[in-house]
């Protein structure tokens, strides 16, 4: 053993000792334990239709939409009054409320022996899981929409989104009389992989506008990357692919409805075990989602040139 490492050599009988056994030199751990990379909650922000005058609590909340009267273009007779026209039955949208939640558990032993703070980490994990789970419920409801365009004319992952797809859907939404969500522009949720293809195809196109050129920064959606052909695009990895096919969702006002009996919230459970060692924390809510105006909802299904 050289004089240089006589006190720290971990393979000899030194004061440093052996890592993992006796000795003063051991592995060090950073007490700050990082969380996984996370996507930001996004999709629930587009819900803009909720019950306004709910009559009573119930397991299903029914919303109704009047049907307009037919146009009249005939001239009235001077003497004979027109026949009264019966008004059609309103359309009905049913929102089924379901109970949702998740629970995690901390113990006195875990908190006492852990090198990192456990309770704060569990609170963070539960709060994110709440937002993440509710956003997935919203996405599942949006994917029930019946208006679908397949990029490239196919139904697999080979076609990539193009400007013509955006123009087609914006035209259809306007033809359906769907109201825009930012002036006359429609909201478009897009995965970054798909956004890459659309922006690469239209690089240098003056019709692609950066967000700051059409809206005050205070009114930007999280992840908003620009507007193009009548829609403003918001990137989110939450719009992930299934079997290589990504959904890009376009919607106007009142595309999706939400009813809430209990707003999802974090719950600190009661400590009920005899020695008060187990401390539950979770989230709980009762809510439901459904498409309210299918005419205000479209999606493009496409692959991506940079998909994994």
Regions from the PLM with identified roles:
Residues 82-128, 132:
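Long, hydrophobic/aromatic-enriched structural stretches that serve as scaffold segments
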Residues 37-100:
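Assembly/oligomerization interface modules of large self-assembling protein complexes
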Residues 146-221:
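Extended, solvent-exposed, turn-rich assembly/linker loops in the middle of proteins
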